[in-house]
Every structure is written in structure tokens, then in C-alpha cells.
UniProtKB/Swiss-Prot annotation:
Name of the gene: FPP5
Family to which this protein belongs: Belongs to the FPP family.
Pfam families in the record: FPP
Domain of life: Eukaryota
Organism: Arabidopsis thaliana (Mouse-ear cress)
Oligomer status and interactors: Interacts with WPP/MAF proteins.
Full protein name: Filament-like plant protein 5
Chain positions covered by the region annotation Disordered: 1-20, 409-482, 496-534, 962-996
Biased composition (Low complexity): 417-428, 503-527
Key words, A-Z: Coiled coil
InterPro entries named among the record's database cross-references: FPP_plant
Biased composition (Polar residues): 471-482
Coiled coil: 59-94, 133-248, 280-301, 359-387, 601-622, 737-841, 876-906
Length: 996
């Protein structure tokens, strides 16, 4: 039993040695019995042998005999005791046999326990290896942790400083931005309220304008329908003109044939030259009259100043929208210190507001202009219509008067009447070739019967020319030759035939036809014999023409006096039937003209009153406008010490107040207004609110209105014409010859004026078309302005969306800052939690170290117990058995505990083996040179970390994860070999101690 160690402390290689002590234990009782028998035989041999001894020895022996006796007694006692001991030994041997069986069973159990202990030893070795590697790793990790904590502390201090600086800077910046944004938000809210009100007003105005545009479009559609009607009428008129041209061509051919037959080309050329000179004179007169009528029309229509002003306004509008940078630069230079503090959104909003205001002003001004132009057009159309109707009626009446006057004068002046009747017969005979024209259409597109007589001036001109020629022809001396008389008649025929060709315009030819139709209508309506008179007159004219032709053809050798007398006689024969009828028509026409003249005078008075009221209202509006626009300028002049503008304003207001009473005239008011405009233009500092783009237009418009009304009130051509007609009627009633001549002259003048008026009417129509085109351009401008309004509204909405985006971005920044604060708090909590976990892990490592030390102490105790048990012999066997059983139980408990610990440590070891990094392998390979004992001694010192540092410094979760993964990484093969060698040394030293 001496050489046997504890089975749980022995290696698998010591199994052979453990079997020998077991055999010794089984043979111990047999050896003890043989030893006792040998001792008894030796004592018997000693008693039989005798030896001679001395006295000393005998005495000594006697003494010894006593002692021997005593010893024999003792031996007997001992024998008895031996017998008792033998009996006891036998009983004990039986017990020993039983114990041997039990020991065999125990040995088998011990062997099983040995195998289990070997497995446990191996597991312990692996666990100790893992512990050693973990301790080495922990030491390295502690070093790394110290470095990391130091670096983290440094980084954290730097980051804390940076964070504090950044937080201070951001808080100050945030406060500034917040204050600025609050101010801007307030301003923008006010601007939005204003913009909302402006937008509401604009929407209302746009709705009104859209309604107005719808009305204008309806009117335009009506006008287009009227234009189509006019086109159809024009086509019909063109057809009539083509027919008339054909007739003219035929007539010209006939005239050429007659000229060739009579061989009078030289004389006709001279006469044509004379006519050309007269025509030049007439053209000069007509041009003068045209200039006069143009002046009158300029007074009625917008003048060239107003048209130029409108063109300038349109050009200024284009410049404003194409290049608004100048105004922006001026405003930026004026408000430089404010513009630096404003953001781009404010600039955009201000620009949008300015553009909106400007566009609204422009649209209002354009609407006012359009309304005024429409009013002017309607007024001019009405006036033209009235003048057309009146002129048509007067033309018809004058035509009838002319015919009656010719017939009336025939009785008194026979030769004159003969020649005049001849010319009229020729002209009327020529006129029958022309077909009647279609009724004309007025400017407004309405067909009227009265307007069909617009075309009268051409016929009046023809008759005037014929009459002049006839008068000239009749005034020649009777002593002229037959050739001169033929020249006169040829001249009459040329005038009758070539007048439409000389006019060279479709309007004059159609006018002649229309005037003839109007005269025929009025004469037919006024007379009781509608168609018979015209037929009889035509027959008489044809008969007269045939007789005159016969006279010229048959009487070639007769003198001129006889030819004239024959023609005169033939005319007098045919005259008697128509004198009575003409006189009746004359008195009817005079009554009608008087009534018409009275009506016209009443209407003129009413028009004058309305014009005077309009003038007073316009002057009052101008006065109010000038006062409102020159307040700031007067204040600035008062500050500068110059009060000229205030004085001129006072003079202007006094002249305006005196104007309704008649103390001051309209020219005085306009002079004062011009002075104010000059003073306003001299102000170069820009303080005057009469801005060029928004205020000049109404002033010029009002000035044009006032001047137009003033000129219209000063001139009235219709009144003059009707005064002339009144004078003519009075002269007709008197019945004097001189008055008749003057009346004829006046009638001729009226015809000329009427022709000029017709020309001016055509020009007015052209002007009307141009004004319509201008109105269309203005409508296009309004559409452009509306599109620009919509674009400005889009810009405003974009600016509002940008503002909303900015506010939302600031809100998101607030939320992001709050999230960052929450993240910082969560990171601090995580650092605290990681520190707590670190402390718990440290305590766990300390507990494992304490357990390892306890196991080492237990192993040492077991070794000492084995040494003690080997020194003792048989008496200590029972104690050894008892202690062995106790130790077995304790060993089983420890095995159970170790198995539990191994199960708890096994997943950690697997994780460590899996997640080992190559860097930590290299570090542990370097650290493998250190002994395990030193590592075990250093472990408690490694895990001591100052709590203040760990509390102060926050650990990044990524860093913590890296540290955790590095702490849990597995060891390499070299580390395993190193730790197996260390454990082999450790257990070999223990086995040596147990062998001792």
C-alpha cells in the first residue's frame, strides 16, 4: 500500500503499478501467521542449549530469570492474549476476507473512478489550458483595455471639448438663426396676409376682366359676322364696279371713235390741258379742305400726341419686362444695408409683389384706355351715322333743289337754260347705262336705307363740272365759229363720259350710282306719280338728244346763231310740261329742311350741355389726380425751401374752381397743368410720385380727353353746314336771282365739302380699322400681362414652398438635435451598463481564480494524505479505508461539480475557439514565454481597474464589441502545446510528491 497513490490522482500509465499493491493487500494476513510460528520455534531452540557463564552473568542471569519468569508470566499472558488475538484474528480474517471482497469491489469502483478521474483530469487539463489561455488573453486584453481606456479617455476628453465648443457655437448660432427666422416668419406672415388680400383683389379683378373679355369676344364675334356681311357687300360692289368699268370702257371707246371721226384731237388736247390745270387747282382746294377736315377729325379722335404716348407706353412696357435689372439695381443700391441681411426668399417675394402690383396697375390702365377708346368709337360711330343720315337727306333734297333751280332759271335765261338742259340731258342719258348699287353698310355693321345716299358727292361733282362747262360755254360770244361750238359740246360729252374714268376709284362711281338711287327714292316717295315721271323725263331727254344731234348733222352750212336758236327752241318746247311739278317739289323740300334744321339745333344744344358737363367732370378728376400725386413732391420742396410747386398747385386749384362759373377758360387750366408738369419733370431727386411707368399715362389721357372735348366744343362742322342750308332755304324763299346764284354757288361748295367729307369718311374708316388693330394688340398685351401675372403668382407660390421647406428643414434639424441628445444619453447608459458587465466579469474571473486555488489546495492535501497513509501500516488501514470512502464521496461530489462547471464553461470555450483573431494569436504567442504561475499571480492585478475612469469615459459600442470579440477569441495550436507542457510539469511534480 506504500507505493499506491490515490486513484483520482494517478495517470493512465500507473495502472500496472496500482495492481501490485492490491495483491500485497490480499496476502497480508498469511504473512503475519507464518512470522509468528517462526518466532516460537526460535524460542524453543534457545531453551535446549546450555552454556557456562560467570557469576556476574549468573547473577545477571538470575536476575534475568526473575525477569524471564516475569516474562514467561507475561508470555503466558501474551499467549492467552495471542489465542485471544488468534481468535480475534480469525474473526478479523473473515472480516478481512469480507473486506477484501469489499475492497475488490471498491477497487473495481476505484478503477472506474480512476477512468472517470482520468477523463476528468483530461477535461481539467483542457479546462486549465483554457483558463490559462483565457488568463493570458485576459492579461493581454487588460493591457489592451488599459490602452483602449486611455485612448478612449483622451478621445472622450477631446470629443467633450469639441462637443462643448460645437454646442456653444451651435447654440449661439441657433439662437441667432432662431431670432432671425422668427422675425422673418413674422414679416413673411404679414407679407402673406398682404399677398392673400392682394391675390383676392386680383382674383376679383381677373374675374371681372374675364367677364369683360367674354363680352368683348361676343362683340368681336358679332363684328366678325358684320365684317363677313360687309365682305359679301364688297364683293357685290366689286361686281357692280366691274360692270361699270366695262360700261366706262365702252363709253370711252365711243368717245375715241367720235374724236377720230371729227378730227379734233388738237383742240381736245388743249382743252384737256386746261382741264388739267383746273383739276390741279381743284385738287389744291380739295387738299386744303382735307387738311381742314383732318384737323376737325383730330379734334374728335385721339390726337397724334396721344397715339405717340400710347406707343411710348407700349415700348416702355416691353423694356420694363425685358430688362428689370435697372430698377432692381437702384432699389438694391438704395437699400444696401437692408439687402445684406435678407435671404434670397425675401428678394423673390419682394420682386413678385412688385411685379404683381405693377401688372395690376398696367391692367387697370389698359382697361381704362380700352373703355375710353370704346366710348370714343361708339360716340364717333353715332356721330358718323347721324351725319350720314343727315347728309343723305340733304343730298337728296339738294339734288331735287338743283333740278328745280335749273328748270326755274330756264324761264329767265333762255340761252343759259338751253345749254344747261343740254348738258343735263347728256349726263342723264349717260347715267342710264349704270345699274343701281347695293345699299351701303355703316361702320357698326347695320344696314340702313339712309346710308345708301352716301355716294352722292360723285354725281354732284359730275353735275357741277357739267354746269360749269355749260355756263362757260354759254358765256362765250355769239360771234365764235361753228368749230368752237362743237368744241363746247365735245367738252360736255367728254366730261360726262370721262368723269368716272378720271375719278379712278370704285367708291366715286358707286357713290354716283347710290346718290342717283337716293334721289330717285326720295323723289318717288314725295311725289304722287311714282314711275310715270321718270319714264316721261327719260323719253323727253332722249328726244332732246336726238333733235340736237340732227341739228348738228343736217345744218352744216348754217351759222352758229341759228343752231343755238334751234336747240333753244327744242328745249323750250319740252320744258313746259315739267315746270309745275318742279315748283311743287321745291316748297316741300324747303319745309322739311327748316324742320330738320330746328331739330339739329336742339340736338346741338343738348350735345353742348353734355360736353360741358363732361369737361367739368374731367377737369375735376384731373385736379383730384394732380393733388393726390404731388403731395410727396410738395413736402420735399417745402423741406428744401422751394415752394414753386405748391404755388402752381394753388393757382391750378383756383383756376379749376373758377372754370364752372366761366371766370377762367379751359386754356388757363391747361396752362397751369403744363406748369405743374414742367416743375415735376425738373425734380431730379426721384421724390415725386408721378412715376414714369404708372402715373404719366392717366395724366396724358386726361389731357387728351380735355383737349378733345375742348376742340369739339369749339368746332362743329355740321352746324355750319346746316346754317348754310338754312341760308339757302331763306334765299330760295325770297326768290331773287342774285340769291339763286349765290345759292347755286353754296350748293356747289356743299357738294365739294360733301365729297371731302366722303373722302374723310373713308379715311376715318381706315383709322377705325387701325384702331381696331391697335385694340387687338392691346388685348394681346393684356393676355401677356395676364400670363406674366400667372408666372408671378407661380413664383410667389414657389417662394412660399421654399419658405415652408426652410421651416420644415429647421424643424427636422430640431428633431435631429433631440435625437442626437437621446443617442448621447443612450450611449451613456450603455457605457454604464458595459461598466457593470465588466465589473461582473471581473468578479467572475476572481471567483474562478479562487476556485482554482481551492482545487490546488485540495490536491496538495490529497497528496499529503497519500504520503501519511503510505507511512502507516496495518493499523491505519481501517482509517485509510474510511478516509478513502469519504474521499471517494468527496471526489464524486467534486466530479459532479466539475462536470457542471465544464458544462457551463463548454459554450464559452467553443465561442473562444471560434472567434479568435490572428492578431490575438500573435500576441498570445509572444505572451506564451511567460510561465503559467506568473500569469496566475498577475491575474488579480490585471483585473484591478480604477472605477472612476471607467465611469467617466464612455465606450463606443463598436469598440466594446471589438474588445469583447478579441477577449473571446480562441488560442492557436502553439498555445495549446505550451499549456499542455505546463500542465504536464504541474501534474508530474504532484506525482513525484505522492511517490515520496
Amino acid at each position: 500500500m506504500e507505493g499506491r497513490g490515490w486513484p483520482w490522482k494517478r495517470k493512465s500509465s500507473d495502472k500496472a503499478t496500482t495492481e501490485k499493491p492490491v495483491v500485497g493487500i490480499e496476502s497480508t494476513p498469511v504473512c503475519s501467521l507464518s512470522y509468528l510460528a517462526s518466532l516460537e520455534n526460535q524460542e524453543k531452540c534457545k531453551n535446549t542449549n546450555y552454556v557456562q557463564i560467570t557469576m556476574d552473568s549468573y547473577t545477571h542471569m538470575s536476575r534475568m530469570e526473575d525477569q524471564v519468569k516475569l516474562f514467561e508470566v507475561q508470555v503466558k499472558d501474551l499467549k492467552e492474549k495471542l489465542t485471544l488475538a488468534h481468535s480475534e484474528i480469525n474473526t478479523k480474517e473473515s472480516l478481512i476476507l469480507q473486506h477484501a471482497k469489499v475492497a475488490e469491489e471498491a477497487v473495481s469502483g476505484w478503477e472506474k473512478a480512476d477512468a472517470e478521474t482520468l477523463a476528468l483530469k483530461r477535461q481539467l487539463e483542457s479546462v486549465t489550458l483554457l483558463k490559462l489561455t483565457a488568463e493570458d488573453r485576459a492579461s493581454h486584453l487588460d493591457d489592451a483595455l488599459k490602452e483602449c481606456t486611455r485612448q478612449i479617455r483622451i478621445v472622450k476628453e477631446e470629443s467633450d471639448k469639441k462637443l462643448q465648443d460645437v454646442i456653444l457655437a451651435k447654440t449661439s448660432q441657433w439662437d441667432k438663426i432662431k431670432a432671425e427666422l422668427e422675425g422673418k416668419i413674422d414679416e413673411l406672415s404679414e407679407g402673406l396676409h398682404r399677398a392673400a388680400s392682394d391675390n383676392a383683389a386680383l382674383t376679383r379683378s381677373l374675374q371681372e376682366r374675364s367677364e369683360m373679355i367674354v363680352r368683348i369676344s361676343e362683340e368681336r364675334s358679332k363684328a366678325e359676322a358684320d365684317v363677313e356681311k360687309l365682305k359679301t357687300n364688297l364683293q357685290l360692289a366689286e361686281k357692280e364696279i366691274s360692270y361699270l368699268k366695262y360700261d366706262l370702257h365702252v363709253a370711252s371707246k365711243e368717245v375715241e371713235i367720235r374724236n377720230e371721226e371729227k378730227n379734233m384731237s388738237l383742240k381736245s388736247a388743249d382743252i384737256a390741258n386746261k382741264q388739267h390745270l383746273e383739276g390741279v387747282k381743284k385738287i389744291a382746294k380739295l387738299e386744303a379742305e382735307c387738311h381742314r377736315l383732318r384737323g376737325l377729325l383730330r379734334k374728335k379722335l385721339p390726337g397724334p400726341a396721344a397715339m405717340a404716348q400710347m406707343k411710348l407706353e407700349v415700348e416702355g412696357l416691353g423694356h420694363e419686362f425685358t430688362d428689370p435689372r435697372a430698377q432692381r439695381n437702384m432699389s438694391q443700391n438704395h437699400n444696401a444695408h437692408i439687402a445684406k441681411a435678407e435671404i434670397s426668399t425675401d428678394h423673390k417675394l419682394e420682386e413678385c409683389k412688385r411685379e404683381n402690383v405693377y401688372l395690376t396697375r398696367r391692367t387697370l390702365e389698359m382697361e381704362e384706355e380700352i373703355q375710353t377708346l370704346k366710348e370714343h368709337l361708339s360716340a364717333r360711330n353715332n356721330e358718323l351715322q347721324v351725319s350720314r343720315n343727315v347728309c343723305a337727306k340733304t343730298l337728296g333734297k339738294l339734288k331735287i333743289l338743283e333740278g328745280q333751280m335749273h328748270m326755274f332759271n330756264n324761264d329767265k335765261n333762255a340761252p343759259k337754260s338751253n345749254s344747261r338742259n343740254l348738258s343735263e340731258s347728256l349726263s342723264s342719258g349717260h347715267d342710264h347705262h349704270y345699274p343701281p348699287s347695293v345699299t351701303s353698310v355703316s361702320e357698326d355693321g347695320f344696314d340702313e336705307e339712309g346710308s345708301s345716299s352716301e355716294c352722292g358727292p360723285a354725281t354732284s361733282l359730275d353735275s357741277h363740272k357739267v354746269r360749269k362747262v355749260s355756263v362757260n360755254g354759254s358765256s362765250k360770244p355769239r360771234s365764235s365759229s361753228r368749230l368752237e361750238l362743237m368744241d363746247d359740246f365735245l367738252e360736255i360729252e367728254k366730261l360726262v363720259g370721262s368723269d368716272p374714268d378720271g375719278a379712278n376709284s370704285a367708291s366715286k362711281s358707286s357713290n354716283s350710282v347710290c346718290s342717283r338711287r337716293s334721289v330717285e327714292k326720295q323723289s318717288s316717295s314725295k311725289s304722287s306719280e311714282p314711275d310715270e315721271d321718270t319714264t316721261t323725263l327719260d323719253q323727253l331727254l332722249m328726244v332732246l338728244r336726238s333733235r340736237i344731234n340732227r341739228i348738228f348733222e343736217s345744218q352744216e352750212g348754217i351759222s352758229i346763231d341759228k343752231i343755238v336758236e334751234a336747240a333753244r327752241f327744242s328745249i323750250q318746247e319740252m320744258q313746259g310740261s315739267s315746270t309745275k311739278r318742279m315748283s311743287s317739289h321745291l316748297f316741300e323740300v324747303t319745309d322739311e329742311t327748316l324742320e330738320k334744321h330746328v331739330d339739329i339745333q336742339n340736338s346741338e344744344k343738348e350735345q353742348k350741355n353734355t360736353k360741358q358737363q363732361d369737361l367739368e367732370a374731367a377737369v375735376a378728376n384731373i385736379h383730384h389726380f394732380i393733388k393726390s400725386t404731388t403731395k410727396e413732391a410738395t413736402q420735399l420742396q417745402d423741406m428744401n425751401g422751394n415752394g414753386q410747386l405748391r404755388e402752381s398747385l394753388e393757382d391750378f386749384s383756383s383756376s379749376v374752381s373758377k372754370y364752372p362759373t366761366g371766370e377762367s377758360s379751359l386754356s388757363d387750366v391747361m396752362l397751369e397743368l403744363s406748369r405743374i408738369s414742367v416743375l415735376a419733370s425738373n425734380l431730379n431727386n426721384g421724390a415725386l410720385t408721378l412715376k414714369p411707368h404708372s402715373k404719366e399715362i392717366p395724366v396724358t389721357e386726361s389731357n387728351d380727353k380735355v383737349t378733345l372735348l375742348f376742340e369739339e366744343s369749339d368746332s362743329n362742322p355740321l352746324g355750319d353746314t346746316f346754317a348754310k342750308t338754312d341760308h339757302c332755304v331763306d334765299n330760295l324763299i325770297n326768290g331773287d336771282d342774285s340769291s339763286c346764284k349765290s345759292l347755286l354757288k353754296e350748293v356747289e361748295q356743299l357738294k365739294l365739302e360733301k365729297e371731302n367729307i366722303a373722302v374723310e369718311l373713308s379715311r376715318c374708316l381706315q383709322n377705325l380699322e387701325s384702331t381696331k388693330a391697335w385694340l387687338e394688340e392691346k388685348e394681346q398685351l393684356i393676355s401677356k400681362l395676364k400670363s406674366q401675372l400667372t408666372s408671378s403668382e407661380d413664383l410667389q407660390s414657389l417662394a412660399e414652398t421654399q419658405l415652408k421647406c426652410v421651416t420644415e428643414s429647421y424643424k427636422s434639424l430640431d428633431l435631429h438635435a433631440k435625437e442626437l441628445e437621446a443617442k448621447v444619453k443612450s450611449l451613456e447608459e450603455e457605457t454604464k451598463r458595459l461598466e457593470m458587465a465588466f465589473t461582473t466579469e471581473k468578479h467572475g474571473h476572481e471567483e474562478t481564480l479562487a476556485k482554482c486555488r481551492d482545487l490546488q489546495e485540495k490536491m496538495q492535501r490529497n497528496e499529503t494524505c497519500e504520503n501519511c497513509s503510505s507511512s502507516k501500516l496495518q493499523p491505519n488501514q481501517e482509517k485509510d479505508i474510511v478516509s478513502a470512502t469519504e474521499k471517494l464521496a468527496a471526489c464524486q461530489e467534486t466530479i459532479h461539480l466539475l462536470s457542471q462547471q465544464l458544462q457551463s464553461l463548454q459554450p464559452q470555450s467553443n465561442h473562444i475557439l471560434k472567434s479568435r483573431s490572428p492578431e490575438k494569436k500573435f500576441q498570445q504567442h509572444k505572451a506564451s514565454e511567460v510561465t503559467p504561475n506568473s500569469a496566475l499571480d498577475d491575474l488579480p492585478h490585471v483585473h484591478i481597474i480604477q472605477p472612476s475612469r471607467s465611469v467617466k469615459h464612455t465606450v463606443n459600442p463598436t469598440v466594446h464589441a471589438i474588445m469583447k470579440s478579441s477577449s473571446v477569441s480562441s488560442s492557436s495550436k502553439e498555445d495549446n502545446e505550451k499549456h499542455t507542457r505546463g500542465l504536464g510539469r504541474f501534474f508530474s511534480s504532484k506525482s513525484k510528491n505522492s511517490a515520496r
